[in-house]
Amino acid sequence: MRAWYFDELPGHQKLPHMGEPVPNQKVYDLGVKHWKIPLDGHEETINQIAKERDYPNRDIINISKEGLGELYDEKMVYFFQEHMHEDEEIRYILDGTGYYDIRETPTDKWIRFQIEAEDLVIIPVGIYHRFTLDEGDYIKSIRLFRADPKWVYMYRSKEMDVNPYRLEYLKQTKEKLGLPVAPAAVGWGAWLWSWITWSKL
């Protein structure tokens, strides 16, 4: 896996936008997990990881013009909007290539890393991220999930910034990085999130 800071220069999202290199350890410190699993016999390893993390269901997705058909352009915009999930995002790449962008704590800079065949990637709960194909315009992957796939995208907003899953992610990440954590941040955020949710009823 290769990682670098997204250069923020004009240009299509599928271009590398390659800025300063980022050590893989920095990506791991932000909660991303990565394994290289050979395609030959990958089923056994995937089954073991799915069992350990309690993800009993899976499907295969082909992200390409051919695979998505008329939904292709819409999905490219959809995947690239900054968002988080309340479940891990687990992908095992069977073929093709693409990019994940994740927000660095505490700078909020984008870090981009490329994924390719034989990569198993877990994007943690609560991290802001986005995905795009690269210029190859194709990726095929296995998706693991706990229940019927809903693929709920929780787009970044002031409301989402106080989501309990988001606050817990920040707390754990800052502790891992040795950064100060406000003692009451998670509790206050959970209360505010409850109030926001209640006010919408």
Curated annotation (Swiss-Prot):
Binding-site positions, Ni(2+): 83, 85, 89, 129
EC number(s) on file: 1.13.11.54, 1.13.11.53
Gene Ontology terms describing biological process: L-methionine salvage from methylthioadenosine
Binding site for Fe(2+): 83, 85, 89, 129
Reactions performed catalytically: 1,2-dihydroxy-5-(methylsulfanyl)pent-1-en-3-one + O2 = 4-methylsulfanyl-2-oxobutanoate + formate + 2 H(+); 1,2-dihydroxy-5-(methylsulfanyl)pent-1-en-3-one + O2 = 3-(methylsulfanyl)propanoate + CO + formate + 2 H(+)
Keywords carried by this UniProt record: Amino-acid biosynthesis, Cytoplasm, Dioxygenase, Iron, Metal-binding, Methionine biosynthesis, Nickel, Nucleus, Oxidoreductase
Main location: cytoplasm
UniProt GO MF annotations: acireductone dioxygenase (Ni2+-requiring) activity; acireductone dioxygenase [iron(II)-requiring] activity; iron ion binding; nickel cation binding
Similarity section: Belongs to the acireductone dioxygenase (ARD) family.
One GO cellular component term noted in the UniProt record for this chain: cytoplasm
Textual note on the cofactor: Binds either 1 Fe or Ni cation per monomer. Iron-binding promotes an acireductone dioxygenase reaction producing 2-keto-4-methylthiobutyrate, while nickel-binding promotes an acireductone dioxygenase reaction producing 3-(methylsulfanyl)propanoate.
Keyword Metal-binding attributed: yes
Cofactor: Fe(2+); Ni(2+)
Subcellular location(s) of the protein: Cytoplasm; Nucleus
EC primary class: oxidoreductase
Protein name: Acireductone dioxygenase 2
CDD domains named in the record: cupin_ARD
UniProt function note: Catalyzes 2 different reactions between oxygen and the acireductone 1,2-dihydroxy-3-keto-5-methylthiopentene (DHK-MTPene) depending upon the metal bound in the active site. Fe-containing acireductone dioxygenase (Fe-ARD) produces formate and 2-keto-4-methylthiobutyrate (KMTB), the alpha-ketoacid precursor of methionine in the methionine recycle pathway. Ni-containing acireductone dioxygenase (Ni-ARD) produces methylthiopropionate, carbon monoxide and formate, and does not lie on the methionine recycle pathway.
Any Pfam family the entry gives: ARD
Lineage of origin: Eukaryota, Fungi, Dikarya, Basidiomycota, Agaricomycotina
